[in-house]
Amino acid sequence: MLPMAQTWGELVHYGFIDQGFGSSKAAPWRAGANENTTISFSHDVKIEGKDLKAGTYGLFLDVEKEGNWTWIFSKNSTSWGSYFYNPGEDALRVPVKPYDATYTEFLTYGFSERNASNATAYLQWESKGASFKIDVPNVNELYVNIVRNELRSSPGFDYQNWMNAAQFCVQNKINLEEALTWAETAISAPFLGQENFNTLQTKAAVLNALNRQAEAAVVMDKAIKMPSATVQAIHQYGRTLLAAGDSKKALEVFQYNFKTHPEEKFTTYVGLARGYTAVGNKKEAIKNWETAIKNLPDNQKANLALYEAELKKLKEGK
């Protein structure tokens, strides 16, 4: 029985070698088998902090017995293996430190540490691995461009996609003027617009991001009166107003929630308690905390100590 070949140094050669075929007299490992191993990027990226233009590249790896390994991105992505490798066609070389890895029987590529704007590509085989970090500059702008184009096709016939696009812009503080148009489309576009709590709240969020708070408040006054406005949605809006320091308006919202949802015996009382606390009416705040705690639902029992602490502070005059 023949001995099994070692992966690194035998199946995968070290350094650059003359493979005895093709035009290359000093070829790196093809980072795979048979045809050219390739990697494609739809947009410009950074590899280990270095710029690489969008496109498809031949991917090679200079494997060394000691020290760093080097990833090579070649402009030639069509030649067979590395038999015709030409360093003059290199688009980028990046040195990386190889690492010890959990045993992997088969050559494996994958992506780890995935985030919105970056990820790490890795190769693992046997007990070794090598990786490179990919960063996408201006990822939010790229995403908005994709969404803008998608809204011109079938996704554009669903109001929720317009709403989601506007929300993305608000969350990332980009493209706000167009986001306002998208939010309005979700509300009032012929055949697809839906005027409901969520679409109005989205428009208000865009207006707030544009520092048009007075207009946003008018939109939210309308939103909380929508049939789709739930107890929790209105309550959360009140909490948002509290966080913004608008205690008077927050109390008005909590009072409206209480008035329009008499069947609710907990959340609306919590809202009133917080609202009255914010405006300095301790008597009403204590009364509403006591009622809320008395009606505590099972799914809130984990927060009982927090509610009791709020009540205790009020009773102690703190």
Predicted regions and their residues:
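Short alpha-helical linear motifs
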Residues: 77-84, 276-278, 309-313
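A conserved position within tetratricopeptide repeats
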Residues: 147-154, 187, 191, 224-225, ...
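Acidic, polar-rich low-complexity tracts and alpha-helical solenoid repeat scaffolds
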Residues: 150-153, 266, 274, 313
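Alpha-helical adaptor scaffolds
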Residues: 160-271
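Long, positively charged, glycine-interspersed low-complexity recognition regions
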Residues: 239, 263, 274, 286, ...
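Extended alpha-helical scaffolding segments
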Residues: 267-274, 278, 282-283
